[in-house]
Amino acid sequence: MVGRLLRKVTLAGLACFLVSVGMSAWFVPARAQSSQSPQQNPSPPDDQTVIRVDVDLVNILFSVRTKKGQLIPNLNKEDFDLYEDGKKQEIQRFSRETDIPLTLGLLIDISASQENLIDIERNAASSFFASVIRPKDEAFLISFGKSTDLLQDYTNSPRLLMAGLKDLHADGGGPIMNPGAVPGIGKPKGTLLFDAVYLAATEKLRGEVGRKALVLITDGEDQGSYYTVKNAIEQAQKADTIVYSFYYVDPYFYSRYGGGFGGGGEGDLRKMSSETGGHVFTVDRKHTLQDVFKELQEELRNQYTLGYTPSNTARDGSYRKIEIKVKQPDMVVQARKGYYATKAGAQ
């Protein structure tokens, strides 16, 4: 069985694993209520608002940069062309990110290879939560190693998120370096990275509306996950969630145990991020974790959303490729590669 996403106080049910849902609406005035079990630390409810959800509307959250990497925040609907499976689509809704609520999950690797970095991660994440979470935003916190643990459920309180960060402790899992002549039995469990992304997408984000993002802090090494990187990407796409990866390696750990000077998981992080519209930030001596969090914060506040109704009206659950083209030269669009169409009969 796959490792479960555990709350520190109560177990989170997995009943929604195989439930198919339609497209979520982003252009709404308030955040929809989650279908999850009662929150560990509930936030005060907003005024009741009637929300109309258009299940056929496809929403895309994206960023635009110069070829040198600078964010471009002031483009308009007329600056873009949109294609689905090579066919041009009509952009029906367009907005620059200003007041659209953000739902964010921070997933932190606590395996042995990250043990020396946890204090740095705790401090940097605390500062990030304090500066980025606004009244209508919500965030949750998950640690992953030999298991996946929900340290703090949805809240818009930086104080509660910081309290959850205090529960970060290395759990001893991680890559086995220079194994001996006698192999272990079964698949060793040490860093359930793919499971953590899969569970966060299915349990926490699938039923949410608005802008959604997962932030991973890890060296990218997965060991023992039940799900594959492909499974993790698929569920993030179905949840309309962007994955941002912070590639953070402790070179001393790998040199000490004969693994060179870095983890080998950067490729999987790039797959997850590029396919969902995010990207990989590399942390090193010249580019600290604090620096990376500041860059992410800037990107989250300089995004665009667009919505369209596909010309392909088939409700077949198929994967469809998306391409957004910007008309100005020397600019690059950062967006997810595609989406899964609503399946007939899906709720």
Role assignments for model-derived ranges:
Residues 25-347:
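Scaffold/interface architecture of coatomer-like assemblies
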Residues 2-26:
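Bacterial N-terminal signal peptides that target proteins for export
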